[in-house]
């Protein structure tokens, strides 16, 4: 078996709208193409031995063990690889379940589709599944050592890529509120919301976490001084930078017991508490000094009591946890080392922050703590005896938590909220040492030891004892108060032809409202009036660029076939999804071989329209009109025929539509007709002579109307939008060159040629065409381009693209010429393969009063050649 290609889908896609995270692996079964599993000796038994947990896969039989029944009866290897890839992820606690395997048009080559949690782990699972299945085919088994290595690698990949527990808590709450989110590449930052409504978080820092407050929280001594000046009970202490100052510092705080910690530490690193001797103080100083970036150390009086974390969000105390240091409880049988291992077997414990609790690690701090208690790792404790392994209670070092939110004294609650206001942090963790949180700190000699920016949420969300607190909810309430938006309107546009023009017109209409519009197209990414990135930008990366921009108020996104197949859409839902048409273009590419399959690709845009949005569909195209059956939102139709039956039935049910009637672009709402503008007054329609441009205008006007854009803004938009080289390069750009005219259009498929031909046929003078086609199109498509050219033009110059896309030089041109001659064996044609030469020749040779129509590979090049001739 051989993996030919692997795609990672990250949004709604051809295979599934709901399951956005999919791996699509193109797999050549090679020698196994004609061998079902029941014909491979020992395969079933080997697979069950290696992965007995596959018994949990239902598959098409619909019951436990169903998949293994299929293997025993006989199924092909692509299907088995799919299930193995899923199971490998399941075994590493990545919940997945969706899969599909489909044979392509090439016998023996399959698309194996399966769900993933982490994309790198998903891709690895696909490769490992192929290795595993191949090994069982060849040897009857898969070595246990290799399986264990695969599972270990998968765990590492997931751990390295997954969100931290606090961030995951916030993201989960955002999802519950239908707030979109996306991971940003910068320092584990996450964006919540789109465009102008976005907020950002990094762990539990937010947009509102001011730099001064964060810096102050990191400055332990500065924080203590400010709180002390405000009358807040804080430890008596001082700072030193040199070892020689340690003895006097101990005297200054009143002698032993003391605490020594780094000035700028976190997560409990470098802290030693309950120091009672000079030797301990020396060791603690060295530890703290090494941990401090500035070599500055805090020496404080030690206060007896339990460690508590108070969490304040947006000025309100939302949770309290008592933190218990890492410890073991004796059973009169096991050594301390064995008890640590037993404790670490708790499924809630993981490495670092990847689970509710962290595994306890034995290091010099643990050994020192045991030594201080006269114990060693091989010591056996009495039953019920508790031995603490660390002095600090951080969860990151194996500690646990008990919820105390309902126990805190009102005065302590008030003090915590006051401290948050004094420091100025929106999300703050306050560390308190007190023997009794139910009593005021002053009454029990309790103190606030420090405050923390970016506090962890694990101890509150999943305490070892007590109630779980949804501390993410108040964060979301702060970032997105009730009724405040998190999304910008998204208009997604797809189709075979007309996408870019419709995208630009829709964006132009929205700009009449005064909003900042971001849009993507085959020309580039634009925000407002400005080009941000040049080139073909119709995929999810470019859409993400718009949705990440903090100035964008409306997103208009051209969504082409290629991006949908390669990565899926960049958004989960849209407000308007426009499908203009589906024609025979790009067939044979990406395993899309029929026009019906292409309609399924384009239909993704209609299917992601949310319940209150509109799918704007072409009622004149049966494949597009049929998409209404899959739409979860509302449907609005457009048609060049006011008598279209679909339009009539739809408006009779008070539906919304746009039609071209009596020369007008009109909106129908139920039985009411609202005329936007006469087509002759809409520049892009070439005085009403370009029907396909009228259809594009219908779609754009209807989309804007569905979104509540004022009629006058729509009217002004279509009146001022021109099919010029500046506004819509490569879309019906007509140039007056004095004695003749030139027209540049990026049509590159039969439907596009037909559409331009409808306009060209009305030209009174000579019609000269400079034609070509992409080399990766089917032979029959290139032949059809030639047939259409022969019907439209008096004279034809056949050229080729610079990028031959896998064909030999002259091959694409020969197919077009075959089409020309099959339509008209007396056609006036000439082959000039170089595009620049063909354009120059056409412009030189066209008759006076004639029209040169150029279908270029490079729109920029064609326009540049024309501009050199100084068009009027």
Curated annotation (Swiss-Prot):
ATP binds at residues 495-501. Its EC number is 6.3.2.29, 6.3.2.30. One of its GO terms (biological process) is biosynthetic process. SUPFAM superfamilies: Glutathione synthetase ATP-binding domain-like, MurD-like peptide ligases, catalytic domain, MurD-like peptide ligases, peptide-binding domain. One of its GO terms (molecular function) is ATP binding. Coiled coil: none annotated. Pfam families: CPSase_L_D2, Cyanophycin_syn, Mur_ligase_C, Mur_ligase_M. Gene3D superfamilies: ATP-grasp fold, B domain, Mur ligase, C-terminal domain, Mur-like, catalytic domain. Residues 224-480 form the ATP-grasp domain. Keywords: ATP-binding, Ligase, Nucleotide-binding. It catalyses: [L-4-(L-arginin-2-N-yl)aspartate](n) + L-aspartate + ATP = [L-4-(L-arginin-2-N-yl)aspartate](n)-L-aspartate + ADP + phosphate + H(+); [L-4-(L-arginin-2-N-yl)aspartate](n)-L-aspartate + L-arginine + ATP = [L-4-(L-arginin-2-N-yl)aspartate](n+1) + ADP + phosphate + H(+). In the C-terminal section; belongs to the MurCDEF family. Homodimer. Catalyzes the ATP-dependent polymerization of arginine and aspartate to multi-L-arginyl-poly-L-aspartic acid (cyanophycin; a water-insoluble reserve polymer). This is Cyanophycin synthetase. The lineage of its organism: Bacteria, Bacillati, Cyanobacteriota, Cyanophyceae, Oscillatoriophycideae. The gene is cphA.
């Amino acid at each position: 078996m051989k993996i030919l290609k692997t795609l990672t889908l990250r949004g709604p896609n051809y295979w599934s709208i709901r399951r956005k995270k999919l791996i699509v692996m193109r797999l050549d079964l090679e020698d196994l193409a004609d061998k079902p599993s029941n014909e491979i000796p020992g395969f079933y038994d080997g697979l069950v031995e290696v992965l007995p947990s596959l018994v949990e896969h239902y598959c098409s039989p619909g019951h436990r063990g169903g998949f293994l029944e299929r293997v025993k009866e006989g199924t092909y290897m692509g299907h088995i690889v799919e299930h193995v890839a899923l199971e490998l992820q399941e075994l590493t606690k990545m919940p997945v379940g969706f899969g599909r395997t489909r044979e392509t048009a090439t016998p023996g080559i399959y698309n194996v589709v399966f769900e993933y949690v982490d994309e790198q782990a998903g891709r690895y699972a696909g490769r490992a599944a192929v290795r595993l299945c191949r090994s069982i085919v060849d040897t009857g088994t898969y070595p246990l050592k290799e399986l264990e290595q695969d599972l270990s690698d998968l765990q590492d990949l997931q751990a390295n890529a997954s969100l931290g527990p606090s961030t995951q808590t916030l993201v989960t709450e955002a999802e519950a509120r239908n707030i979109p989110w996306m991971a940003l590449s910068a320092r584990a930052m996450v964006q919540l919301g789109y465009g102008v409504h976005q907020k950002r978080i990094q762990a539990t820092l937010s947009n509102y976490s001011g730099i001064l407050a964060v810096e102050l929280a990191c400055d332990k001594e500065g924080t203590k001084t400010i709180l002390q000046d405000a009358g807040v009970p804080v430890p008596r202490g001082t700072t030193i930078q040199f070892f020689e100052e340690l003895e006097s510092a101990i005297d200054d705080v009143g002698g032993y017991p003391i605490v020594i910690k780094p000035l700028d530490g976190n997560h409990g690193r470098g802290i030693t508490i309950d120091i009672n001797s000079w030797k301990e103080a020396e060791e603690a100083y060295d530890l703290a000094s090494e941990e401090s970036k500035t070599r500055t150390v805090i020496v404080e009086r030690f206060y007896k009591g339990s460690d508590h974390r108070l969490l304040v969000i947006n000025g309100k105390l939302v949770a309290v946890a008592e933190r218990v240091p890492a410890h073991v409880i004796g059973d009169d049988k096991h050594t301390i080392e064995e008890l640590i291992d037993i404790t670490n077997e708790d499924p809630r414990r993981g490495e670092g922050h990847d689970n509710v609790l962290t595994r306890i690690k034995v290091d010099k701090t643990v050994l020192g703590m045991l030594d201080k208690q006269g114990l060693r790792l091989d010591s056996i404790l009495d039953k019920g005896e508790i031995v603490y392994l660390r002095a600090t209670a951080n969860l990151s070092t194996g500690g646990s938590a008990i919820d105390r939110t309902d126990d805190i004294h009102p005065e302590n609650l008030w003090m915590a909220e006051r401290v948050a206001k004094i420091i100025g942090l929106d999300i703050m963790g306050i560390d308190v040492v007190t023997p009794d949180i139910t009593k005021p700190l002053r009454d029990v000699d309790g103190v606030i030891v420090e405050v923390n920016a970016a506090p962890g949420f694990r101890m509150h969300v999943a305490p070892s004892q007590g109630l779980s607190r949804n501390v993410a909810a108040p964060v979301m309430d702060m970032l997105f108060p009730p009724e405040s938006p998190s999304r910008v309107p998204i208009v997604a546009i797809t189709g075979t032809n007309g996408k870019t023009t419709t995208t630009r017109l829709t964006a132009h209409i929205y700009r009449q409202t005064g909003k900042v519009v971001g849009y993507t197209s085959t020309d580039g990414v634009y925000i407002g009036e400005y080009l941000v990135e040049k080139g073909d930008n119709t995929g999810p990366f470019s859409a993400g660029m718009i949705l990440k921009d903090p100035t964008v108020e409306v997103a208009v996104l051209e969504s082409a076939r290629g991006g949908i197949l390669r990565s899926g859409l960049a958004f989960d839902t849209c407000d308007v999804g426009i499908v203009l048409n589906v024609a025979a273009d790009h067939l044979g590419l990406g395993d899309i071989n029929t026009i019906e399959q292409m309609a399924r690709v384009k239909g993704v845009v209609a299917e992601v329209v949310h319940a209150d949005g509109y799918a704007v569909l072409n009622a004149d195209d049966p494949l597009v009109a049929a998409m209404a059956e899959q739409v979860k939102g509302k449907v609005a139709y457009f048609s060049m025929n006011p008598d279209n039956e679909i339009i009539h039935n739809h408006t009779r049910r008070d539906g919304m539509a746009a039609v071209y009637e009596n020369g007008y672009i009109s909106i129908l709402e139920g039985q009411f007709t609202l005329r936007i503008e006469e087509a002759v007054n809409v520049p892009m329609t070439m005085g009403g002579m370009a029907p396909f441009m009228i259809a594009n205008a219908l779609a754009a006007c209807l989309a804007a109307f569905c979104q509540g854009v004022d009629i006058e803004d729509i009217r002004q938009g279509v009146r001022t939008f021109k099919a010029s080289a500046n506004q819509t390069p490569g879309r019906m750009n007509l140039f007056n060159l004095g004695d003749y005219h030139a027209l540049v259009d990026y049509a590159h498929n039969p439907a596009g040629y037909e559409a331009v031909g409808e306009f060209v046929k009305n030209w009174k003078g000579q019609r000269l065409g400079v034609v070509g086609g992409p080399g990766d199109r089917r032979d029959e498509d290139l032949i059809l381009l030639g047939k259409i050219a022969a019907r439209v033009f008096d004279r034809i110059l056949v050229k080729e693209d610079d990028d031959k896309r896998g064909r030999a030089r002259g091959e694409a041109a020969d197919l077009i010429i075959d089409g020309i001659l099959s339509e008209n064996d007396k056609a006036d044609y000439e082959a000039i393969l170089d595009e620049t030469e063909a354009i120059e020749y056409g412009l030189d040779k066209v008759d006076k009063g004639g029209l040169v129509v150029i279908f270029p590979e490079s729109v920029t090049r064609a326009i540049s050649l024309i501009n050199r001739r100084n068009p009027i």
